[in-house]
Amino acid sequence: MAEIGIVGLGKMGANMAERLRKAGHDVTGFDRDEGSGRDVESLSELVHALPTPRVVWVMVPAGEPTYATVRELQGLLAEGDVVVDGGNSRYTDDQRHAEDLAGTGISFVDAGVSGGVWGLTEGYALMVGGTDGDVATVQPFFDALKPDGESGFVHAGPVGAGHFAKMVHNGIEYGLMQAYAEGWELLQAADVVTDVTAVFDSWRSGTVIRSWLLDLLVNAVKQDDDLSELRGYAEDSGEGRWTVQAAVDHAVPLPVITAALFARFGSRQQDSPAMKVIAALRNQFGGHAVTSSAGSQQVGADSPGADATAPAGTHDPASGRARGAAGTVPAEGAR
């Protein structure tokens, strides 16, 4: 079997190293954290422990941590070696890494990896970018990491294609999760369905919306029926933003994924400034009720089509006269 080095032994990296070892490969792991279970104490030691041509798989956070790791590897590796970035890097970063490494004869392959903490037992879906020759060099490791069967691996194209495919995959994931979440909220809000968890559980078999995400949702709500242990606060990994930005660059309409991303932004606001503006404007033009920051509500007409009392001194454009508090203005829906 082949030998490989893995840089980054977090949840994903450590599990991938274990899966590779179970498949019979020799793995040398390095992480800057002394408590990570690393095999060596430096990148230099990792490189010197591997036979040539070397394959080094990088599993560190995207951005500067990946850039710093690739830069250091560039000074340690030799012509014919291959660097694989299996993190969630942006595809444009891949292209830059490949260009930088090419000057010293080092190859670069990008691998979009999906599977999370379940990948150790179920396998990792792999979306790969690189030349045919470089992908072939790493193929034994791809075969060990991927799920059993014919699917779960794709050579998507040249360098950058793997992470571009993974980026779109994550964008789709945003949309799917948002759809399940909205359906859940509507079922909970109505008094028609008495067992929302059972409804979602029933959808896991035979329906057109069954999926692994649905399985995970049912698992979560069976542990916490109304999700009361959680706050409605959702971070984003960054790939949803990249997906939306790529859609703008290519003039591709992406309403569902964009809305799902923006919903996460909204979840992180304690008090929406935009909604404050809307509340203020509705009160100004229609006298609609508003709620103060202290929680008290001012009286005003807030039902569709209702007339509202105008603030004293409001100018009536039809009569040219200033109206007092007794005057009326059309409600929001009538304007």
Feature map (PLM): residue ranges:
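NAD(P)+-binding Rossmann beta1-loop-alpha1 motif at the extreme N-terminus of oxidoreductases
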Residues: M1-R54, V117-G119, N283
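Rossmann-fold dinucleotide-binding core
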Residues: I4, T69-R71, R90-A181, E185-L187
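Conserved dinucleotide-binding and phosphotransfer motif residues
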Residues: A23, T104, H250
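Hydrophobic beta-strand scaffold residues
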Residues: V27, F108-V109, L254
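Rossmann-like NAD(P)-binding element
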Residues: R32-E34, R38-R96, L120-G130
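Helical "substrate-binding/catalytic lid" subdomain
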Residues: M127, T137, G160-H288
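Intrinsically disordered, low-complexity terminal tails and inter-domain linkers enriched
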Residues: S293-A334
